[in-house]
Amino acid sequence: MPPLLTNRQAEELHKSMIAYLVASDLPDTAAALRREVNLSEDVFDPTTAKRYEGMLEKKWTSIARLQKKIMDLESRNATLQSELDNSTPASRLKRNQDPASWLPSTVRYSLESHRDKVNCVAFHPTFSSIASGSDDCTIKIWDWELGELERTLKGHTRAVRDVDYGGPRDNVLLASCSSDLSIKLWKPTDNYKNIRTLQGHDHIVSAVRFIPSRNLLVSASRDNDMRIWDVTTGYCVKTINGHTDWVRDVSISFDGRFLFSTGQDMTARLWDISTVSNIEHKRTMLGHENFIECCAFAPPTSYQFLAPLAGLGKRPSSTNGADFMATGSRDNTIKIWDSRGTCLMTLVGHDSWVQALVFHPGGKYLLSVSDDKTLRCWDLNQQGKCVKTLDAHESFVTSLRWAPGVAKNVPGGDGAAEGEGNDKNGAGSENPANIQMRCVVATGGWDQKLKIFAG
């Protein structure tokens, strides 16, 4: 049988034992052991003995503590296994098969590496990657399933304001925008190489969003304009004017035909962008009493809950893709609108600025985050009642995203829905019946943390 200890480990053990015997006033026993293990007195002198004194006792007590910890963990594991075994099959089935009613509650990971506040987050449409952008001028790529930092992207010279994944399925890109007035495109399949920098805005670029099914990207800026870019060439193909102050946020409809924008002019504006060369301003929504920070299109699954409020009947087989939308404002409220510009409901509950919104892919809920440090869940089937409030961060919450769904029965596994790269909601333009919902939500905050809530 091979020895359990290396020669060095055995020598250390022998010296510790001899030091223990000497300290215990057992010199004859110590001398006998020294002879047995061939340790001469000049090798194990009084100075060496002093150095090893107490080492055996420390190792012994450490082993005892570890043994107790192991026993405690084994007991806890047995308790949890018993609880799992005793849970009813029906309850397990409900947890596993009812993502439409899932709401975030438990933080799976609290990820830390940024050196300043986190401004934005975005899920990769296919892989378990998530990007976060910060005032520290960097973008960090994480594995949200493992809770591990994968890489840090450097290139911007000022705060990173927004990030978004999108583009063609076979060539997904990450877009980022910054207070340095630039937009950068990064290629995930090439170690996130910065393949292009888009210049044209005259002030802070506050938001970027890919348009589904097209090689186009929309950006919003403090220069009061929005721009549409061709990501294959890097050229600006259209500048959209209309807002009279800083454009804070943009959202793209699930079919890619409509753009929704909000700004410091306290307006929300709906645009038809189906023909880029002839963009049409459809509607201006008025009602907020302060700057509008964020916006989101409602997914098709929300139609059944919001249509009665708008006096509409059963959802037609084909809609304009922009039936309902939501806005969040510095007046602490959230408003739900229809495409006619009518405010259907105002959600009151936050105690400070509303910073980000996302609709539940199941359509029944709207989620929001705020400078009041909370994440709130609103039930659209109960007149927008707030049904859950979470203390999400230790300071202002800046950003919120829902992981995009994955298309079912797609060979090769490359079947993510086209949505996270298109809209904050993380759902695509495909038939919802063909999308498998993922119960994963991410938030970012002034506490420099990225948090992952997962079912």
From Swiss-Prot:
Annotated compartments: Cytoplasm, Cytoskeleton; Cytoplasm, Cytoskeleton, Spindle pole
Keyword Zinc: no
Location of region: Disordered: 408-431
Classification via CDD domains: WD40
WD-type repeats, residues: 113-154, 156-196, 200-239, 242-281, 287-347, 349-388, 392-438, 440-455
A GO term for molecular function: dynein complex binding
Keywords noted in UniProt: Cell cycle, Cell division, Coiled coil, Cytoplasm, Cytoskeleton, Microtubule, Mitosis, Repeat, Transport, WD repeat
Record domain LisH: where: 9-41
Highest taxon of the lineage: Eukaryota
CC terms in the record's Gene Ontology section: cytoplasm; microtubule; microtubule associated complex; spindle pole
Coiled coil: 61-88
InterPro entries: Dynein_regulator_LIS1, G-protein_beta_WD-40_rep, LIS1_N, LisH, PAC1-like_LisH-like_dom, WD40/YVTN_repeat-like_dom_sf, WD40_repeat_CS, WD40_repeat_dom_sf
Cited SMART domains: WD40
GO biological process terms on file: cell division; establishment of mitotic spindle orientation; microtubule sliding
Family recorded in the similarity comment: Belongs to the WD repeat LIS1/nudF family.
Functional description taken from the UniProt entry: Positively regulates the activity of the minus-end directed microtubule motor protein dynein. May enhance dynein-mediated microtubule sliding by targeting dynein to the microtubule plus end. Required for nuclear migration during vegetative growth as well as development. Required for retrograde early endosome (EE) transport from the hyphal tip. Required for localization of dynein to the mitotic spindle poles. Recruits additional proteins to the dynein complex at SPBs.
Free-text comment about domains: Dimerization mediated by the LisH domain may be required to activate dynein.
Assembly with partners or alone: Self-associates. Interacts with nudE and dynein.
Protein name, UniProt field: Nuclear distribution protein nudF
Organism: Aspergillus oryzae (strain ATCC 42149 / RIB 40) (Yellow koji mold)
